[in-house]
Curated annotation (Swiss-Prot):
Taxonomic path: Bacteria, Pseudomonadati, Pseudomonadota, Betaproteobacteria, Burkholderiales
Protein name: Chaperone protein DnaK
Molecular-function GO term, any one: ATP binding
Keyword annotations from UniProtKB, A to Z: ATP-binding, Chaperone, Nucleotide-binding, Phosphoprotein, Stress response
Compositionally skewed regions (Basic and acidic residues) per UniProt: 632-641
CDD domains named in the record: ASKHA_NBD_HSP70_DnaK-like (cd10234)
């Protein structure tokens, strides 16, 4: 049975792990790194770069290099948070036909799940290279505060990447799994997972209990902000640099896409450096130019300055912590451990704030970049039956309900309800002889339905004529273990049951997913073709170099016509190298190999002659040095005793 891998699909970085020989193994990618930047670049020649190669060329290709796409997944274009990102991102965010936020590259519209699928494909390939077998199943993590649309979109991304997503698991819960299974402490423990990543923030209160030798992880509550993370911290630094440069040089860098990409890189680097040093210098020569000539950027930033810039962002993480503690029905003093997850938790000011709120030092024995993927791999091993000593009880992060008379949100399933769960409630008609009802499903905590996230709507038709309030329509909400919602309705009067799944007012249709799966497969073929082409070019290049070298050494031993023939074949191969396809290059390589045959024979003959000369020399050296030695006869003389 093939392994179920665990993937942490992050806003900034992604990570893949697997349970191998009973131990969690974080798998290194082709570049030798344990995490992969969640960056996808679409090149002019049709090639798609993912991870570090995409990040390296971002400065020169800002419009076609997509990063932090997770912030758009499952979101509407008109949402306030998306509108804010439109002004900040160098790439183009556009409105899809269904109202979702998509991106545009080379004039082609792409859905965020399609872009995320490229990252997942790299994670899949990384795992396959390590395991030496095909991988088709995965557990993928999402922020605990992701809503239904965002979870559905993440699942779609997995399908487009050629993965069957066995489970969508919340990131803090995954980190708790990775932490809890390592620990030898006995007895029940309540832990807090504070997860501040590249684009999202989550906090979960989790109880770890030993129930008859089985480790039970029960999520008591969760809260967060899906638009708060390291990207926002970077933006504060970028804004500061722009304002300082404008003061100093009178030039506004915010309109210069190339400069912005360089600033983003520098801001991220400065932020990381200031976690371990008190001061850093941002040095960007030739950042821009005006009539007076090129301008250089040189700016010192202290840790204190950075902390002042981001203080309000760190403060914003505390309110969700307060709400999570209250919802879990525990006191801060009941918490046994505080676990920090996500790269941003390396910032000393963040650690201080967490310590101040929870009144205890956060644990330092959990790797903030790898814990989530490790937990996902553990959950994968539970689902495959490899591990049987772990039980995970997660919750739905937001309340679910329907819109009833007067636009009120009637909650069917309260937030922090353990999943999977099912709940039914009976509703009726608002008018006499009403033939149908429209059921609108929402997710959120507001009292008025319109203030919450609309997940979809459906009609129940064919209700027999009756006075209002008489028909009985039973609505059932069913949340699966992935936190994804299914809704059905039944007319109790007629006994007629309609199984109705929400017709999502956003997200990808089945046809779109299938088309994207085909696109991804075609891409894989294209990637394979490009890899083969690169290999053919490298081999051809090596042959040209070796032939030239041999021609220099042995060329004078050839006939003039033979030499010309080889030189012509070299030129033909060089001409085709940059523009030709694999078949054309292979043909010219074959032609050069044939033309060089005589040269090879001459080289071989020369080497043979050299070898024979060396052997002769060695044989001569082995002869005795003195030829004048005379052999003497001797006779044994026996002495008388």
């Amino acid at each position: 049975m093939s392994k179920i891998i665990g993937i942490d699909l992050g806003t900034t970085n992604s990570c893949v792990a697997v349970l191998d020989g009973g131990q969690v193994k974080i798998i290194e990618n082709a570049e030798g790194a344990r995490t992969t930047p969640s960056i996808v670049a679409y090149m002019d020649d049709g090639e798609t770069l993912v991870g570090a190669p995409a990040k390296r060329q971002a400065v020169t290709n800002p419009k076609n290099t997509l990063y932090a796409v997770k912030r758009l997944i499952g979101r509407k274009f008109d949402e306030k948070a998306v509108q804010k990102d439109i002004d900040l991102m160098p790439y183009s965010i556009v409105k899809a036909d269904n109202g979702d936020a998509w991106v545009e590259v080379h004039g082609k519209k792409l859905a965020p799940p399609q872009v995320s699928a490229e990252v997942l494909r790299k994670m899949k390939k990384t795992a396959e290279d390590y395991l030496g077998e095909e991988v088709t199943e995965a557990v993928i993590t999402v922020p605990a505060y992701f809503n239904d649309s965002q979870r559905q979109a993440t699942k779609d991304a997995g399908r487009i990447a050629g993965l069957e997503v066995k489970r969508i698991i919340n990131e803090p819960t995954a980190a708790a799994l990775a932490f809890g299974l390592d620990k030898t402490e006995k007895g029940d423990r309540k832990i807090v997972v504070y997860d501040l990543g590249g684009g999202t923030f989550d906090v979960s209160i989790i109880e770890i209990a030993d129930v008859d030798g089985e480790m039970q992880f029960e999520v008591l509550s969760t809260n967060g902000d899906t638009f708060l993370g390291g990207e926002d911290f970077d933006q504060r630094i970028i804004d500061y640099i722009i304002s300082e440069f404008k003061k100093e040089q009178g030039v506004d860098l915010s309109k210069d896409v190339l400069a912005l990409q360089r600033l983003k890189e520098a801001a991220e680097k400065a932020k990381i450096e200031l976690s371990s040093s008190q001061q850093t210098e941002i040095n960007l020569p030739y950042i821009t130019a005006d009539a007076s000539g090129p301008k250089h950027l040189n700016l010192k930033i202290t840790r204190a300055k950075l902390e002042a810039l981001v203080e309000e962002l760190i403060e914003r993480t505390i309110e969700p912590c307060r709400v999570a503690i209250k919802d879990a029905g525990v006191k801060v003093s009941d918490i046994d451990d505080v676990i920090l997850v996500g790269g941003m938790t390396r910032m000393p000011k963040v650690q201080d704030k967490v310590k101040e709120f929870f009144g205890r030092e956060p644990r330092k024995d959990v790797n903030p970049d790898e814990a989530v993927a490790a937990g996902a791999a553990i959950q994968g091993s539970v689902l495959s039956g490899e591990r049987k000593d772990v039980l995970l009880l997660d919750v739905t992060p937001l309340s679910l309900g329907i819109e009833t008379l007067g636009g009120v949100m009637t909650k069917m399933i309260q937030k922090n309800t353990t999943i999977p769960t099912r709940y039914s409630q009976t509703f009726s008609t608002a008018d006499d002889n009403q033939p149908a009802v429209t059921i609108k499903v929402f997710q959120g905590e507001r009292e008025i339905a319109a203030g919450n996230k609309g997940l979809g709507e459906f009609n129940l038709e064919g209700i027999p004529p009756a006075p209002r309030g008489l028909p009985q329509i039973e609505v059932t909400f069913d949340i699966d273990a992935n936190g994804i919602l299914h809704v059905s309705a039944k007319d109790k009067g007629t006994g007629k049951e309609n199984k109705i799944t929400i017709k999502a007012n956003s997200g990808l249709s089945e046809d779109e997913i299938q088309r994207m799966v085909k696109d991804a497969e075609a891409n894989a073929e294209e990637d394979h073709r490009l890899a083969e082409l690169a290999q053919a070019r490298n081999q051809a290049d090596a042959l040209v170099h070796a032939t030239r070298k041999s021609l220099t050494e042995y060329g004078e031993k050839l006939e003039a016509a033979e030499k010309e023939s080889i030189e012509a074949a070299i030129k033909d191969l060089e001409d085709i190298l940059k523009t030709g396809d694999k078949a054309e290059i292979d043909a010219k390589v074959e032609a050069l190999s044939t033309a060089s045959q005589k040269l090879g024979e001459k080289m071989y003959a020369d080497m043979q002659a050299q070898q024979q000369a060396q052997q002769q020399q060695a044989a001569d050296n082995a002869k005795p040095v003195d030829d004048n030695v005379v052999d003497a006869d001797f006779k044994e003389v026996k002495r008388d005793q």
